[in-house]
Amino acid sequence: VSFAAESYGYAPEEVAARTEKALSLVKLEGKAGTAVYRLSGGQKKLAAIAGVLTLSPELLLLDEPSASLDPKNQRNLLNILRNLPSALLLASHDLDFVYDCCDRVLVLHKGRLVADGPGETVLRDKALLESAELELPLRFQ
């Protein structure tokens, strides 16, 4: 988790503080010294996100961030992302997570943009989603 902050050149005390804060955000406080191979798949994903958060990025690029997370950790990640001052660019097939996380939604199908608008509008449009081979989020079914 501390690798990014160390590589960026922060002083050791700053690295420790940023790492502790990031681990706390993702609810992995007790895992600071744990070998990666001892973490579950979901914990590995959260640890990777924590590592990025040590840099306080202005933009986060996330690919399927909710995949391999149990419902509790999905909610935790959602709360983290909602409260970050960072902009998010998120690729996901989990449209319920997208709805909860994103203000603006773009839908791509076969490499082409087929929709761009507020999540409330785009993710309720059954015909549009079906044309892109997607299903309505569960909350709208």
How should each PLM-predicted stretch be described?
Residues 60-63:
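Catalytic Walker B motif of ABC-type/P-loop ATPase nucleotide-binding domains
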Residues 98-100:
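A short, surface-exposed alpha-helical micro-motif characterized by mixed small hydrophobic
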